[in-house]
């Protein structure tokens, strides 16, 4: 799979590098967090939210909105699914990582998406990017099989269990995105080979992308 640097102009439609906030301490603390054999995501970690980066990112990057800082760590080389939010997400990498991204605008009317349209970018250690709200993404991937540690910043309350019942694919509302809603502020399309929960909408067409191929 062709992997471009995060500074390549091709990334501009997906996000931008953040260089106006000091995240040194965030990277340092992130390097003390666990790196399992699989992938673990924690939406909110007290030790990360106690750092100066919490206020700086809330004030500068999110325009004084309340935010949460967690992490996505582990070992991974596969796409498995794509998701998007109603807001930008910040990925702050304590290690090298690969981001596989696409465009929400390319989701078909039947709520499917062709993975051949996705691109991969290398996010170097000690680098943070804003991933725009319309950018399809999922868990980062490691470089050459190595583990990764990436802090994940989102508006507070994102990625928690839903409280309401939402429309299924056979509902009148299926023309909209409601069947994709998998958690608060999280719309998801899974791949049949992604090992997702049975409740996930499976709509990715094409290969379950592998960054090592």
Which role does the model predict for each range below?
Residues 1-125, 139-147, 151-213:
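Active-site region of the double-stranded beta-helix
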Residues 127-129, 134-138:
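Histidine-centered metal-chelating micro-motifs
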């Amino acid at each position: 799979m062709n992997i471009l640097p995060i500074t390549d102009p091709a990334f501009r439609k997906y996000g931008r590098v953040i260089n106006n906030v000091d995240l040194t301490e965030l990277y340092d603390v992130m390097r003390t967090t666990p790196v399992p054999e699989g992938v673990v995501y924690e939406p909110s970690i007290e030790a990360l939210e106690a750092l100066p980066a919490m206020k700086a990112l809330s004030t500068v990057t999110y325009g004084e909105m309340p935010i949460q800082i967690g992490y996505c760590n582990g070992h991974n080389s596969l796409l498995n699914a794509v998701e998007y939010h109603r807001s930008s997400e910040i990925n702050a990498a304590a290690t090298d990582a690969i981001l596989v991204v696409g465009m929400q605008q390319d989701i078909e009317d039947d709520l499917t998406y062709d993975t051949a349209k996705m691109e991969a970018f290398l996010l170097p250690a000690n680098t943070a990017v804003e991933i725009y709200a319309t950018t399809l993404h999922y868990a980062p991937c490691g470089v050459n099989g190595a583990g990764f540690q990436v802090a994940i910043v989102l508006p507070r309350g994102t990625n928690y269990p839903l409280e309401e019942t939402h429309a299924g694919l056979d509902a009148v509302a299926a023309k909209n995105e409601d069947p994709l809603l998998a958690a608060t502020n999280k719309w998801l399309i899974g791949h049949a080979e992604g090992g997702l929960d049975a409740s996930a909408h499976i709509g990715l067409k094409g290969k379950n992308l592998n960054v090592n191929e």
